[in-house]
Amino acid sequence: MKINSSEIIIADSTLGDEKDLVHILKTTWLATYPSKEIGITKEDILSKDFDSEKKVSAWRETIKVSGKKSKYVCVAKDKDKIVGFCKASKKKGFNELDVLYILPEYQGMGIGRKLLDRAVDWLGRKKKIFLKVAAHNKNAIGFYEKYGFVKTGLIKRDRLVNGKVMPEAEMALRLKPN
């Protein structure tokens, strides 16, 4: 099946999207994060229990307040199928790009840039925008650097249930003067 990226629509997330978001999280984590270099296996990734009702419910609650308060979620759709999403948060003193995930078969088509543009528009450029990315995810780091993010440092954070640590790079988007 040939995918036409011009048919991809970026939209605000709505209630009912939460199971699709969890599916995309699980699929992209399994495709991206296992690494012999840092000792993370597929089993380690699966230990996050992506499919739990607790995770689905947490996304449902986030979608309910999306755009109204300090959180925003947008999705990329190929017809009726959600193929990617982005979540951003307004914090005191700075803003944050919390997540940006696209199904592997849809990566490299400009969808990430469209989602990021939408999130940055919502956040505004009055405060720095930070993100954290797995330090071994060179494709994502390159994508963010092309967008204008710069590395600020390396953070070690326990992300997995089994106690394994996945090193992350923190990045910040330079503010552009008005």
List each model region and its residues.
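Flexible, glycine- and charge-enriched loops at secondary-structure boundaries
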Residues: 52, 109, 164
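C-terminal "cap" of GNAT-fold acetyltransferases
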Residues: 130-141, 145-147, 157-178
